[in-house]
Amino acid sequence: LRSAPDNTYLTQWMKHFNNLATFLPFARAHGYEGMIETSWSTSGTYGFHYDNGWEIISMQPIRQVYPMSGFQLLIDAYCKAVNSSKAIHAETFIKEYAQQRYGLSEDEAQTFLNYFLLPQELVRHGKDAKGKPIEQVIQECEELKSNFNKIVPRKQGGEFEHYRLMLDLRINYLQYKEVEFTYESSRYDVSQASGLATQLKKIIGEAGKLDKRFIKLNKDYLKPGQAEEINALRNEKMNELYRTLSRQAGL
């Protein structure tokens, strides 16, 4: 149901649907009698604090994922796929789910489907993993957001807000990565520090609003303090870059 590189700001929805559509029929055809679902939410990705001689002082999980509270659709798709003799068809399932669970119109269901079809990749050096420039990635997300925000669910409105939040977290991450790319570029000059700091301050301000939405939606699902910890880890890198830029700019 979930796997890397999924993160709080990235979900490869169609990869997970493809797993349901291909592996479950394979398992059934090869005599599987059941499956045990396990959870290793960090996928074993940790950061380490070392002493001399590479002695480990502490370990911190560094891969945080959006809670399963936002993935009821994927859970229901899994249940349907397990209980059907035919392979699940992702696009058909998603559109029917949109209409039945959220009360969306046919046009809204198509927009809902487009949400899941949008490619999501990690971004490094100003491009995503497929080589698409970050400016284009942001533009595509913003265009989807504009259309997606027009959807008005008639049912399960609280659950639906998870989709909006995940997209906003994605955009916030991409906007930060755009600033980071400029800072890490060989063309960067310290004279740009003030402008980048101003740009990043706005992004961090938006991240603070997203933090509040994340806590509101997940406070009853996560353990006390866990939502705040996930927020802090998600924002840590952008806050560190802001401090660096502020020092360089003399702010």
Residues covered by each model-derived region:
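Substrate-binding groove of N-acetylhexosamine-processing glycoside hydrolases
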Residues: 1-251
